[in-house]
């Protein structure tokens, strides 16, 4: 019998970034009959608007909290060097596109490294396209696919699936056995 462990995340979720070392340990110790499936959560819809100063301060404070509580480090230059947007759907779409080429984990890692360590903005198309190229995806095809109705539909389907799991916080883990779903408490 195959079990499914759903990992519900957003590639631009700072708590998901902090959870990465724990998730990697979980994957090492999982039985071979448990398949891990990533589901993007979609924290924030497409937007070109600059994030309000209040929201910027709130998110940067979350980064400080994570540094203090968990020890994960962030490059706070992001808040000085970038024009932050409250928009993660583009990063979610990039993750799905990378999945189609078996590069999902590389894309998640590239997005998180760019955002949290290199102070780059994954809500900008130029950044996302350069990350696709960096992990070996065809730049032109990726850019074209990023604009397609198919990726928009695929993202909406994944967000609807996430909602059907009643997940409202990221990261989340849910184990599926037969038709039953079992939420798993997250520990860092």
Question: Language-model segments: which ranges?
Answer:
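Structural alpha/beta surface segment adjacent to cysteine/selenocysteine redox centers
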Residues: 20-118
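C-terminal cap of thioredoxin/glutaredoxin-like
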Residues: 8, 12, 18-28, 34, ...
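Extreme N-terminal starter segment of soluble prokaryotic enzymes
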Residues: 1-6
């Amino acid at each position: 019998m195959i079990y499914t462990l759903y990992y519900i995340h957003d590639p631009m979720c700072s708590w998901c970034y902090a959870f990465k070392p724990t998730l990697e340990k979980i994957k090492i110790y999982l039985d071979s009959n448990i398949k891990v499936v990533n589901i993007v959560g979609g924290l924030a819809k497409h937007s070109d608007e600059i994030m309000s100063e209040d929201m910027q301060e709130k998110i940067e404070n979350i980064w400080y909290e994570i540094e203090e509580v968990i020890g994960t480090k962030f490059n706070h230059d992001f808040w000085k060097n970038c024009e932050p947007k409250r928009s993660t759907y583009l990063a979610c779409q990039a993750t799905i596109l990378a999945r189609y080429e078996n590069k999902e984990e590389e894309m998640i890692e590239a997005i998180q490294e760019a955002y949290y360590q290199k102070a780059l903005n994954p809500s900008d198309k130029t950044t996302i396209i350069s990350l696709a190229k960096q992990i070996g995806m065809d730049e032109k095809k990726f850019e074209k696919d990023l604009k397609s109705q198919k990726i928009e539909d695929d993202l909406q389907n994944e967000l609807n699936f996430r909602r059907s799991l009643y997940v409202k916080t990221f990261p989340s883990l849910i184990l599926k056995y037969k038709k039953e779903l079992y939420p798993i408490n997250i520990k860092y």
